[in-house]
Curated annotation (Swiss-Prot):
Basic and acidic residues: compositionally biased ranges: 85-94
HAMAP family from the UniProt entry: ATP_synth_b_bprime
Membrane spanning residue stretches: 7-27
Keyword Cell membrane: yes
Organism: Oenococcus oeni (strain ATCC BAA-331 / PSU-1)
Record key words, sorted: ATP synthesis, Cell membrane, CF(0), Hydrogen ion transport, Ion transport, Membrane, Transmembrane, Transmembrane helix, Transport
Broad class of the protein's primary localization: membrane
PANTHER family assigned to the protein according to its UniProt record, in alphabetical order: ATP SYNTHASE SUBUNIT B, ATP SYNTHASE SUBUNIT B', CHLOROPLASTIC
Superkingdom per UniProt: Bacteria
Protein name: ATP synthase subunit b
Family: Belongs to the ATPase B chain family.
Amino acid sequence: MLTTIAIQIPDGSAIFVLLTFILLMFILKKLAWGPITKIMDARANQINDDLDSAAKSKNEAKKLQTVADTNLKESQSQATALMENARKSSEEQSKKIVDLAQAHADSINRQAQIDARQIKDDALDSAKDEIADLSVSIASRIIGKEITASKHKALIDDFISELEKQQENSPVKEKS
């Protein structure tokens, strides 16, 4: 169809159409091409700015994630340290309580042993005195005369000492 139109147009009008077309392009370039390219450039700039902004936001998010991860690790480390310190503190406290209880038990045991020895010594002294008095009484009746208490006590002390030595040498010993 164009070929038929071009064939029918005389040569002079082809030049006119060509000049009109060139003039139309020039007018379009002056009036419409500038604003269109400005709009296209503005849109391209907007897209580039949006891409840059997205990249910056992504980098900022990565930095924030890194900071958050670091803070989380530090918090976990601090929590672990606090738990370890609490465990050590409780173990130390427990050991102190056990040591204090053991020391108290040892003190009570020592005091009980001292009291038992004192009771034993008091009983032996009392028995010695009673035996001495009884012996003096029996001996004075048998002999018919009185032995002085100091001489008799010395005899009894010697006798008891020998009994204690024999008891120490015997296979059955007291438990203290």
